[in-house]
């Protein structure tokens, strides 16, 4: 019973993780999008280093 519910949850996660066919060309872009906030966070440190952490 527990295994069946785990299988159902994993199937739902897999379905939510796939883009519809119409958006297939953007699949590689979507893979990179979560990295963008990290880049802004690192940019803040570079900016502060350039102004000597005032």
From Swiss-Prot:
SUPFAM superfamilies given in the database record: Photosystem II reaction center protein K, PsbK
Single GO BP term: photosynthesis
Recorded topology in the membrane: Single-pass membrane protein
Pfam families in UniProt: PsbK
Subcellular location: Plastid, Chloroplast thylakoid membrane
Record-level GO cellular component terms: chloroplast thylakoid membrane; photosystem II reaction center
Domain of life of the organism encoding this protein: Eukaryota
Regions that span the bilayer: 29-49
Major localization listed first in the record, in broad terms: plastid
Keywords attached to this entry: Chloroplast, Membrane, Photosynthesis, Photosystem II, Plastid, Reaction center, Thylakoid, Transmembrane, Transmembrane helix
Propeptide: 1-17
UniProt xrefs under NCBIfam families: PRK02553.1
Role of this protein: One of the components of the core complex of photosystem II (PSII). PSII is a light-driven water:plastoquinone oxidoreductase that uses light energy to abstract electrons from H(2)O, generating O(2) and a proton gradient subsequently used for ATP formation. It consists of a core antenna complex that captures photons, and an electron transfer chain that converts photonic excitation into a charge separation.
Family: Belongs to the PsbK family.
Subunit structure: PSII is composed of 1 copy each of membrane proteins PsbA, PsbB, PsbC, PsbD, PsbE, PsbF, PsbH, PsbI, PsbJ, PsbK, PsbL, PsbM, PsbT, PsbY, PsbZ, Psb30/Ycf12, at least 3 peripheral proteins of the oxygen-evolving complex and a large number of cofactors. It forms dimeric complexes.
Protein name (Swiss-Prot/TrEMBL): Photosystem II reaction center protein K
Species assigned in the record: Euglena stellata
Gene: psbK
């Amino acid at each position: 019973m527990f295994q069946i519910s785990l299988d159902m949850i994993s199937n739902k996660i897999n379905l939510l993780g796939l883009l519809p066919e119409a958006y297939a060309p953007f699949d590689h872009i979507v893979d990179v999008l979560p990295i963008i906030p990290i880049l802004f966070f690192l940019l803040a440190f570079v900016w502060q280093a350039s102004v000597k952490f005032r």
